[in-house]
A protein has these predicted regions:
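A glycine-rich helix N-cap at a beta->alpha junction
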Residues: 115-151
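C-terminal accessory domains and tails appended to enzymatic cores
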Residues: 7-8, 260-263, 280-354
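Histidine-anchored nucleotide/phosphate-binding helix
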Residues: 77-96
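Positively charged, low-complexity intrinsically disordered leader regions
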Residues: 1-61
């Protein structure tokens, strides 16, 4: 292993560890990480960022699929949506790419309001997105499975294919075609069927990355056996409806990230992107994190418990801001101190552990 390889490995380990901090303490994030790390073979954050760098070029579309509707208010949750908006900003900063949010119509006003906060113009016409600077797109996606099939084909046939598709905290149908919340309740009627589009793009060889924090999200079928064995409600006949399929999403992804909170997994990928490109501006500030969370909550997005107080998966704005700041500080230190500690690198590598 070279010094550079060790630096990259350790930054990935740091970011993976941060996104899997477990203040709640019941350990699901560690279970998922064990499976996703075994599948990936290296730090998840660095892997995803590296794949993006290898394929994304200036002007490329990148589809960001997100949006999970929760009971009892039938409102979109914060997790997934907040990081999707901040990821859109990062992709413009890193590549001058053209991000397109694909989500339930319920999320449209939040996307509109948050786009202003991150400094991007929002268009539904992708021709405008492609030709205009500092712009992003939105495509509201159908909740009807039959119409979703047609819409997915239409999106693929009528637009330039994206360089990548990234799903963040997006519900995925189980093997019976049903969508569930974390505790096994059926939410099929509420959810956009965006996993249909994700899978079609994957079949076409588009770079695909899926981020989840439980197993009911798009792409988590990649580690199906692991999730079915260890995650509650995931196995067959363990959900609370009559479908008998469990909450595990059947869809698979070539690259996955699992974390305590899906947004934290996305932030880890974004921080890794900033590190690999040696450009700290790619990663957002704690202040922008708080601003987007506030805009999202004022647009009707809820915490997982249904509250309109800004929070993501039960974690307050303060905790999310601290997470962003700590990830950012790790990356900044790594970039600013590259080339230092040469003696220690040489000595450590000489011992043969790495």
């Amino acid at each position: 292993m070279t010094k550079k390889e060790l630096e990259i490995l350790q930054m990935g380990e740091n970011l993976d560890a941060l996104m899997n901090l477990d203040p709640r303490g019941y350990g699901v994030c560690r279970i998922l990480y064990n499976g996703s790390r075994a599948y990936t073979g290296r730090p998840l954050t660095i892997n995803a960022a590296d794949k993006l760098i290898s394929v994304v070029r200036k002007g490329d579309f990148i589809y960001i699929i997100t949006g999970f509707i929760l009971m009892p208010h039938k409102a979109p949750e914060m997790d997934g949506m907040v990081s999707s908006m901040l990821l859109a900003r990062s992709l413009v900063q890193a590549f001058e790419a053209k991000p397109v949010i694909i989500c339930p119509v319920d999320c449209k006003s939040a996307v509109e309001n948050c786009a202003r906060v991150i400094g991007l113009h929002l268009y539904e016409n992708l021709v405008d997105v492609e030709k205009l600077p500092f712009s992003m797109g939105i495509i509201p996606f159908s909740k009807d499975a039959v119409l979703a099939e047609k819409q997915a084909e239409q999106i693929i046939s009528q637009n330039k294919l994206p360089a990548a598709v990234i799903s963040i905290e997006t519900p995925g149908a189980n093997q019976a075609g049903e969508y569930h919340n974390a505790t096994g309740n059926n939410l099929t009627e509420l959810e956009a069927k965006t996993d249909i589009l994700f899978s079609k793009l994957r079949e076409k060889g588009i770079l695909n990355i899926a981020i989840g924090d439980l197993g009911n999200e798009i792409g988590m079928g990649t580690i199906a056996d692991h999730i079915k064995r260890y995650i509650p409600y995931a196995d067959d006949k363990q959900c609370r409806c009559n479908c008998q399929g469990g909450i595990l999403a059947a869809s698979k992804a070539d690259h996955i990230i699992t974390a305590t909170v899906s947004d934290w997994g996305c932030y880890g990928m974004m921080a890794a992107l900033a590190y690999l490109k040696k450009d700290f501006r790619i990663f957002h500030s704690g202040k922008l994190e708080a601003d987007v969370m506030e805009a999202a909550s004022r647009s009707g997005l809820v915490d997982m418990n249904g509250s309109l107080v800004p929070g993501i998966d039960g974690f307050s704005s303060r905790i999310n801001v601290d997470m962003v700041r700590l990830m950012g500080d790790c990356v900044r230190f790594g970039i600013e101190n590259e080339g230092r500690f040469e003696e220690w690198f040489e000595a450590v590598l000489g011992k043969g552990f790495y």
